[in-house]
Design a protein with these regions (language model features):
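Class I SAM-dependent methyltransferase SAM/SAH-binding core
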Residues: 55-57, 61-108
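Acceptor-substrate binding/catalytic loop of class I
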Residues: 152, 156, 184-199
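A short glycine-rich, Lys/Arg-flanked "PGG" loop and its adjoining helix->strand segment in the class I
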Residues: 132-147
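Short alpha-helix
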Residues: 191-214
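Conserved class I S-adenosyl-L-methionine
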Residues: 1-50, 63-67, 148-179
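Core SAM-dependent methyltransferase catalytic element
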Residues: 207-209, 230-252
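A short acidic, Gly/Pro-enriched loop at the edge of an enzyme's catalytic core
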Residues: 110-119
């Protein structure tokens, strides 16, 4: 799928989800992913958040940024492909309304360079049409010593399915082709990528980052994600496989 179509499907899809105002599975801080035993309150990955400047890639309505602001972040910025989500983020943060921009994360925007203490991508990195560009621009925006924190579905979890009440492997871990998925009760189309761990690590390294931490957290057995029951997120699959992988990259 070409980049233009990829972006257009996701832009329209997220706008539709917000306009329809129906529940869908969503991950926001302090949670890093579905079913995890620990969240940011226990993990303390952003241990220097007080007074920090934070940029959220795929910020949605600003819920994760609200958590960080309440924890002491001084300045918050957000990018999102959905104008409907950005509208809600600006309402949530009228004092920072000029800091919320409608844009794909993989395109350069007019925000300060060498500026942010933290850049976060909480369950949004798989919706980029260009992983390399996302890392490239994130490196430009981040201050020296700053951290880029990414959480996303564990790539092996993508390979699992349930058939005849058994967990089976039905996809290749090596398949990184983009695919159409549906989200929410109305089954709205979105496009996402499954990325091997090595792909993420190598792309980050190619753009100047080094890996500071990698987390594969244990899960708890639940039937819903923040109250929403999903056919993809199933407790049976998390018994022996992490639902989420968390990368913490650092800029030299």
């Amino acid at each position: 799928m070409n980049k233009k179509d990829f972006i257009e499907i996701n832009k329209n899809g997220w706008n539709t989800l917000i306009i329809n105002n129906k529940p869908f599975s969503n991950t926001i801080l302090p949670e890093y992913g579905p079913f995890l035993k620990r969240n940011e309150n226990e993990m303390n990955i952003m241990n220097n958040i007080n007074g920090a400047k934070v940029l959220d890639l795929g910020c949605g309505e600003g819920e994760s940024l609200e958590y960080l602001f309440n924890k002491g972040a001084k300045e918050i910025w957000g990018l999102d492909i959905s104008k409907e989500q950005i509208k809600k983020a600006k309402i949530r943060f009228p004092q920072f309304k000029d800091n919320f921009l409608v844009s794909p994360m993989e395109e350069e925007v007019n925000i300060p360079n060498n500026y942010f203490d933290y850049i976060i991508s909480i369950f949004s990195i798989g919706y980029t049409s260009d992983l390399n560009s996302t890392f490239k621009y994130s490196y430009k925006y981040l201050a020296n010593g700053g951290k880029f924190i990414i959480s996303w579905t564990h790539p092996f979890y993508y390979c699992l399915d349930i058939a005849d009440d058994k967990v089976v492997i039905n996809k290749s871990y090596f398949n990184e082709e983009s695919e159409i998925i549906t989200k929410g009760p109305d089954k709205v189309n979105l496009v996402q990528n499954n990325m091997m761990i090595s792909t993420v690590l190598n792309t980050a390294s190619d753009n100047g980052f080094y890996l500071d931490k990698l987390y594969e957290e244990e899960t708890i057995l639940k039937d819903d994600v923040n109250g929403y029951k999903s056919t993809f997120w199933r407790k049976e699959k998390t018994v022996n496989c992490p639902s989420t992988i968390i990368f913490v990259f650092k800029k030299h």
